[in-house]
Swiss-Prot record:
Region Disordered, residue ranges: 54-81
Free-text function comment from the UniProt entry: Endonuclease that specifically degrades the RNA of RNA-DNA hybrids.
Note: Present with 149 molecules/cell in log phase SD medium.
Binding residues for Mg(2+) 1: 193, 235, 264
Protein name: Ribonuclease H
Binding residues annotated for Mg(2+) 2, in chain numbering: 193, 338
């Protein structure tokens, strides 16, 4: 018997897949140019809709309609580096090989987690990968034919970072390298959020906020001044402006802080932690909302490379990524960022 209910199929959007609530679907299509999506009364109809053209994606998507998880397609783009990453785990389950390096396989499924309580892993078969990612949020997974590329995906290594910043590796290191004799122990969480009153309507007003925990004088609360007044654009700008301020403080103030950005935008989290690594400048400029995306990625890369370059100077070894948090779930920092975003939108 066909499964009945409400099923929202996204054939073209930020994440293709099947969703069982409108809000989940909306997050994938709102503000996305040329989005293709449709509501169905049965899971089988929604699945059939996805089987039409324009369904392919290099990334998999973990959705919540009956536990459906879309299998990622292979990428043959290979990114090589000198050192192997430290922050990932190979398979340990009894159904999988204990060592990827000894496994007789040319297929690697890399799962990168953007939340602290879920471990990043690499699998050598789709079945185990699918079981691991099912019903999990805040993660991204991708298929590779090269183990180093799969590891790079998790560790955040990119061949394009310096090109995106329009600076050579040597110039960046010469300009921003700190003395290794100094250790900085202070850390700070920065919560970012966007808001849009009347989101999706012609009269919508959007704003963004960033809450610097323990440093209220640094908080950001501004209206979104350009482009479509969508919640998605406001969330992008919130993280972008927070990164801009973080960069200014890292490069101008004597006391350095290890900042950690937290946002409830899965799109921004996955873009910065995972997806931008396969984009060059031309690809970035072709993305929806590129007027905000390009500076967002450039600012993120600068901060990330700064911490990488000076990792021995920071207590947490310079670890920096965008952490996804569940929105409207009682997290005081996230609620404060939401308040600042709404305050900014009210000034539009």
């Amino acid at each position: 018997m066909a499964r009945q209910g409400n099923f929202y199929a996204v054939r073209k959007g930020r994440e293709t897949g099947i969703y069982n609530t409108w809000n989940e679907c909306k997050n994938q299509v709102d503000g996305y140019g040329g989005a293709i999506y449709k509501k169905f009364n049965s899971y089988e109809q929604a699945k059939s809709f996805l089987g039409q053209p324009n369904t392919t994606s290099n990334y998999g998507s973990s959705t919540h309609a009956g536990g459906q998880v879309s299998k990622p397609h292979t990428t043959q783009k290979r990114v090589h580096r000198r050192n192997r990453p430290l922050h990932y785990s190979s398979l340990t389950s009894s159904s999988a090989c204990s060592s990827l390096s000894s496994a007789n396989t040319n297929t690697f499924y890399s799962v990168k987690s953007n939340v602290p309580n879920i471990e990043s892993k690499i699998f050598n078969n789709w079945k185990d990968c699918q079981a691991y990612v099912k019903h999990k949020r805040g993660i991204t997974f991708k298929k590779f034919e090269d183990q180093l590329a799969a590891e790079n995906f998790i560790s955040g290594m990119s061949a394009h970072d310096y090109k995106l910043m329009n600076i050579s590796k040597e110039s960046f290191e010469s300009k921003y390298k700190l003395s290794s004799n100094t250790m900085y122990n202070k850390s700070m969480n920065v919560y970012c959020d966007g808001s849009s009153f009347g989101n999706g309507t012609s009269s919508s007003r959007a704003g963004y906020g960033a809450y610097f925990e323990g440093a209220p004088e640094e908080n950001i609360s501004e209206p979104l001044l350009s482009g479509a007044q969508t919640n998605n654009r406001a969330e992008i700008e919130a993280v972008s402006e927070a990164l801009k301020k973080i960069w200014e403080k890292l490069t101008n103030e004597k006391e350095k802080v290890n900042y950690q950005i937290k946002t409830d935008s899965e799109y921004v989290t996955k873009l910065l932690n995972d997806r931008y690594m396969t984009y060059d400048n031309k690809k970035l400029e072709g993305l929806p909302n590129s007027d905000l995306i390009v500076p967002l990625v450039q600012r993120f890369v600068k901060v990330k490379k700064y911490y990488e370059l000076n990792k021995e100077c920071f207590k947490n070894n310079g670890k920096f990524q965008i952490e996804w948090v569940k929105g409207h779930d009682g997290d005081p920092g996230n609620e404060m960022a939401d308040f600042l975003a709404k305050k900014g939108a009210s000034r539009r």
